[in-house]
Amino acid sequence: MALYEHVFLARQDITPQQVDGLVEQYKGVIEANGGKVGRVENWGLKSLTYRIKKNRKAHYVLMDIDAPAPAVHEVERQMRINEDILRYMTIAVDKHEEGPSAMMQKRDRDDRPRGEGRGPRDDRGPRPDRGDRDDRPRRPREDRA
């Protein structure tokens, strides 16, 4: 059987539970046609670069699929019919990547705390107080007539 990565975008106005229902529906289609679904990642609600069918946001989902080609064709056929699916893309891969996808790694990196929690400033020490800056001499102004 061939290996595929399948990403689909669902409408913004459906609930996360409905997105999970769509995932289960398509998992059932793949398993009924002799395939299996490996990793499923829900990337959440993200902004679209441009509007698709009057939607500015979409729920993104990634599925790793190990299935024969007819199973993938059936999933794509059902996604074309479903009004909740805005876009989908299926790519044949040589092997599935281990661990989280690049999008999930980015989310984990973005979730790290910033500012005070980042650690010391090495040998520079804390930042000095800048005061109200009135202690500096004023720059001479040219009077315009």
Swiss-Prot record:
Pfam families listed in its UniProt record: Ribosomal_S6 (PF01250)
Cellular component annotations (GO), alphabetically ordered: cytosolic small ribosomal subunit
GO-annotated molecular function: small ribosomal subunit rRNA binding; structural constituent of ribosome
Keywords for this protein: Ribonucleoprotein, Ribosomal protein, RNA-binding, rRNA-binding
Domain of life assignment: Bacteria
Stretch list, region Disordered: 94-145
Example GO biological process: translation
Entry function: Binds together with bS18 to 16S ribosomal RNA.
Family in the record: Belongs to the bacterial ribosomal protein bS6 family.
Name of this chain's protein: Small ribosomal subunit protein bS6
Organism for this UniProt entry: Sinorhizobium medicae (strain WSM419) (Ensifer medicae)
Lineage, opening ranks: Bacteria, Pseudomonadati, Pseudomonadota, Alphaproteobacteria, Hyphomicrobiales
